[in-house]
Regions:
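N-terminal Lys/Arg-rich, disordered targeting/topogenic segments
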Residues: 1-6
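Serine-dependent protease modules
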Residues: 9-14, 20-294
Length: 294
């Protein structure tokens, strides 16, 4: 072998050795860099928490089973005076329990007084028979009957009604009645699921569900109530019924709907339970609500 050939081979070995060192260094340094990079990526602060993956619609059957016995149907009867020349009909909203009656029978009996009936919902807050409902459900009624889910019926006394908040308190003579658990609407968030139980069109213990659409909603001429807006199906007869959160707690009283057709259009409004319970406390104590004035 000549010297020139030997030098070439040694040069090749030297080059291969260098390449081998570079390759080893590259392979050796690749893994630690990747691990360090991955570790940095994992520990880096995240702009927003990851949202839980959807798991399907919530099962509300347990809430209904637990609370339906404490939701009541409220039937009212009253008298309306009419004259032939100028029928004296009150201005009613589509959600009012008397609305459908007047729509169908307006002008049918032109003279004297007419006996009218209506329906709404309510719920028991004390086992000795204290019930919350809407003031407009019992407005003008001289007879109020409460029907429980177990078909028992009681004559109810109107302890008091506050038109400003649309809250009324009824009392029946009974003991050991099922009651709802009240929660805090202030802890609610837009987008949360809610459930209503009531008697739409007289169909007792009907459950409907939806989400909270907005909180602290102000409505025209409603200065005292920061309404909970939902898309829960609420129809005539639901008025006065409870609105539950997914913990099975009452967070509101279904009170009004917004509709151009007279039926449900996805805009329902509930009175926060905190407002209702403050009114209940005053009505139970004095029969009226006192408000501070400047």
């Amino acid at each position: 072998m000549d010297k020139r050939s030997l030098k070439l081979k040694r040069g090749a070995v030297a080059v291969l050795a260098v390449l081998g060192l570079l390759g080893a260094y590259g392979l050796g340094s690749l893994q630690p860099w990747s691990a360090a990079h991955a570790e940095t990526a994992v520990s880096a602060p995240v702009a927003a928490p990851a949202l839980p993956l959807p798991t399907g619609l919530p099962d509300m059957s347990a809430i209904v089973a637990r609370n339906a016995p404490a939701v009541v149907n409220v039937s009212v009867a009253g008298k309306v005076r009419r004259t032939a020349e100028a029928p004296d009909f009150p201005s009613l909203e589509p959600g009012d329990p008397f609305y459908e009656f007047f729509r169908r029978f307006q002008g049918a009996q032109p003279h004297g007084e007419q006996r009218v009936r209506g329906q709404g919902s309510g719920f028991i807050v004390r086992e000795d028979g204290v019930i919350l409902t809407n003031a407009h459900v019992v407005d003008g009624a001289d007879e109020v009957t409460v029907r429980l889910a177990d078909k028992r019926e009681f004559k109810a006394k109107v302890i008091g009604a506050d038109k400003a908040t649309d809250v009324a308190v009824l009392k029946v003579e009974a003991r050991g009645l099922p009651v709802v658990k009240t929660g805090a609407s202030a802890k609610s968030r837009v987008g949360e699921w809610v459930l209503a139980i009531g008697s739409p069109f007289g169909f007792e213990s009907s459950a409907t569900a939806g989400i909270i659409s907005a909180l602290s909603r102000a409505l025209p001429d409603e200065n005292y109530v920061p309404f909970i807006q939902t898309d829960v199906a609420v129809n005539p007869g639901n008025s006065g019924g409870p609105l539950f959160n997914m913990a099975g707690e009452v967070i509101g009283i279904n009170s009004q709907i917004y509709s151009r057709s007279g039926g449900y259009q996805g805009l329902s409004f509930a009175i926060p339970i905190e407002v209702a319970m403050k009114v209940e406390a005053q009505l139970m104590k004095t029969g009226q609500v006192q408000r501070g004035r400047l």
